[in-house]
A protein has these predicted regions:
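Cystatin/cathelin-like cysteine-protease inhibitor module
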Residues: 19-128
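Sec-dependent bacterial lipoprotein signal peptides
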Residues: 1-19
């Protein structure tokens, strides 16, 4: 009986931690987009995927994503990233959101955002 109670308590604590990280990742992405989208677009968030770790992204891929995303017309060109936040394992989340320009034209975008393990910095993002 004690084992079952221990396992249930541990599962509950892990679930709460996971929910907290998911919320933190969503907030980080929203803050990042609010800072780095051009001001002539209104952004509304549709959905987010689950937060997932990956060890498949290296510094060259990060640099390539940053360069590619800086060419998009709705993204500011002078995004400041923290290179010290790039570690062997990153966390990623996919976000789908709608941009509405001044004329009312909507564009739905899905992008993947890569973050450090502490969920303090977006280190890169890419178009899906």
């Amino acid at each position: 009986m004690k084992k079952i109670l221990y396992v249930l308590t541990l599962s509950f604590v892990l679930a709460l931690t996971s929910c907290g990280d998911q919320y933190k990742a969503k907030s980080l992405v929203k803050d990042f987009l609010n800072e780095n989208l051009t001001t002539d677009n209104d952004c509304s968030y549709e959905r987010f995927s689950n937060l997932t770790p990956t060890a498949m992204i290296d510094i060259d891929q990060v640099k390539s994503m940053r360069k590619e995303m800086s060419t998009l017309p709705y993204v500011k060109k002078d995004i400041s990233y923290n290179d010290n936040a790039i570690t062997d394992t990153l966390l990623y989340i996919r976000a789908t959101y709608k941009l509405t320009d001044k004329e009312g034209k909507q564009q739905e975008l899905t992008q993947t955002f890569y973050m450090d393990k502490a969920l303090t910095h977006v280190v890169a993002f890419k178009q899906n």
